[in-house]
Amino acid sequence: MIIGRLRSAQGRRWALLLVALVVDLLHSVLVEKRREAAVAQLHWLQSRNACEPLYGRIGIFIYADQLERYEGTIACWKCYADSRGYEQFVVKPFAEDQRCQRRCGHIVSVFFRRHCVAAVYLDRVDWLLFVDADSFPVNFHRCVEEFIDPDYQIIHYERFFSGEVAAGSYLVRNSDQSRDYLLDWAEQSFVLNQINVHNMDNGVLQLHVLRTVGVDHNRLALCWEKFRNASSLVGYFAFVGCTKRSLLEHRTAAGHSRRSVKVLAPLGGWLRDVWLTGGHWTDRDFVLHDLKRQNAFLKRFVSEPNCPSSADTAGWLWSLGPTKLGYKVSVDTASRLLAKAERRSARYHPDVFFPGASSSLVVSQYDEMRGN
């Protein structure tokens, strides 16, 4: 009987210990949830001040060939646009309105046609953010206005791993100069017939930027020759390295006297490829790219009825369920992952990662932005 009482007392002690552990665990979870809610509230309050319409009406333009394939990201962009007061335009290739058909109907390549259609949509807003359908805003507290420079007509950014001026996303002002820039780019699909390795509209864009900013004709001819003779990716990136060096040298010699096109440094823009950090992201990121495989979870939760409330935007997409686990990291962690990606890219593309190139500075710049 005494032994039974002892066992009973021991059992109660274990039960009390277990309850204490559960309470402690729940308390930790509640504290973390409160902290996340406070951070989200802070980001929202900051965004209310940062997203004032300083540059007029902002539009987000998506050209998607398979709307059902990108249902999740398109819905996410709609939530973001509605929360910021931006307009959203989703256009399907070869199903555009009559204005677009009249102006762009002769352009067969979707990669070039999309820039022509974007030019037609320009007159609906003051600034247009062109984005790929497989991209999405991961932090709603970031604003398009952060990246607008009113001294320029077109704003590009350099892609981190390749050194290319990115063709898949750009900011463009509603102006005759911008419209001509996009239409001229769109009309250059014929160039691909002369090139073996061209990367579609990306390769053409590198030369288009150089011509627009007024790079020396001899330098242009040198880069064109590299482009025309490229027979492999090695040759293509030698061409990209040529255009990158030419743009950097032109900036040094001429400054920014011709304020037409601005090219932001890698990670200095609004978008980066999500695979660079293995799917991880931070509060610093704005738009993540290359979400081609959109699972049922994303499609289910990222829809208009489930848009976040105004006080719960930052991190909303990833607080909905298992997708969040292990993906949001500190800026330190992301910087280490980016440094690793940079070393890998430098081995594969030495012509792009040369001394003095902007790519060699971006990881430290990303790390320095943690307080912003």
Regions found by a protein language model. Give the residues of each.
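Catalytic core and acceptor-binding pocket of nucleotide-sugar-dependent glycosyltransferases
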Residues: 115-116, 177-372
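Structural recognition of the beta-strand scaffold that forms the well-ordered cores
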Residues: 89-90, 129-130, 154-157, 169-171, ...
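Short coil/turn segments at secondary-structure boundaries
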Residues: 71-76, 93-94, 142-143, 168-170, ...
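Extracellular/periplasmic catalytic domains that process cell-envelope and extracellular macromolecules
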Residues: 51-55, 122-123, 147-149, 161-165, ...
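Solvent-exposed loop/turn segments at secondary-structure junctions
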Residues: 66-67, 95, 135-137, 160-162, ...
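Conserved donor-nucleotide/metal-binding helix-loop-beta segment in metal-dependent transferases, i.e.
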Residues: 135-176
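N-terminal anchoring/stem segment of glycosyltransferases
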Residues: 2-125, 176, 327-372
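Short beta-strand-to-loop acidic/aromatic patch adjacent to the donor-nucleotide binding site
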Residues: 118, 125-136
